[in-house]
Design a protein with these regions (language model features):
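N-terminal leader/linker segments that precede catalytic domains of diphosphate-processing enzymes
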Residues: 1-80, 85-143, 173-211
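NUDIX/MutT-family hydrolases
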Residues: 147-183, 187
Length: 211
């Protein structure tokens, strides 16, 4: 998919937003049950992540992901978007996402011509207690990015087609904290993208795949 086509489709987000594929949702095989409290009633910390689309060398659309360093406080070794908790000086969740992207991958939003397109459905992250809002944006040209060594082991520009409705979703079983889970994951290079990141990408793919 060309980046111009993707951006054109995303300029007017549907209301309501389509759901991510059900195959991505986790099933608890063992351990404590999942909380039944609605998202809006959970005690949580506001956070923002940047879902940044950038053109590949051939003009197709890619999305920037990070592989977290092993041994970090949360999400050690996992694939995620640049982002983190809101700080008091942040004007809004968009400011949070852009600030965190500058800190984690060295994004200069002005130099890259970043344009914010909107926000996707918030996700609650049980392990960190974050209420995460995905901020959708694109850059008109490929930005110069550098991983912050204390947080990011590498930066991945994943093809957007890897998350469209026809994309492969692998079924995985793993121990996550106190729970044994079965969940769906997107294969990207030598990694598996799962959890909240996969659900955000699945919703993005559902938006782009609508007729």
């Amino acid at each position: 998919m060309r980046i111009e086509e993707a951006v054109q489709r995303l300029r007017t987000l549907p209301d309501p937003l389509p759901a991510a594929p059900r195959a991505l949702m986790p099933t608890i095989l063992g351990g404590p049950p999942r909380s039944s409290v609605p998202l809006g009633e959970l005690r949580s910390t506001p956070a923002g992540v940047l879902v940044l689309l950038v053109p590949a060398l051939d003009g197709t659309a890619t999305v920037i992901l990070t592989e977290r360093v092993v041994g970090g406080r949360y999400h050690s070794g996992e694939v995620s978007f640049p982002g983190g908790r809101a700080e008091p000086e942040d004007r809004d969740v968009i400011a949070t996402a852009l600030r965190e992207a500058a800190e984690e991958v060295g994004l200069d939003a002005d130099a890259a011509g970043v344009e914010v397109l909107g926000t996707l459905e918030p996700v609650w992250i049980p392990v960190s207690g974050f209420r995460l809002t995905p901020v959708l944006a694109w850059a008109g040209h490929r930005p110069a990015l550098t991983p912050a060594p204390s947080e990011v082991s590498r930066i991945i520009a994943a093809p957007l087609t890897a998350f469209l409705p026809a994309a492969e979703i692998r079924r995985v079983e793993a121990q996550v904290g106190e729970r044994r889970l079965r969940y769906g994951a997107y294969p990207v290079e030598d990694l598996l993208v799962w959890g909240a990141t996969a659900r955000v990408l699945g919703q993005l793919g559902a938006i782009l795949g609508r007729s």
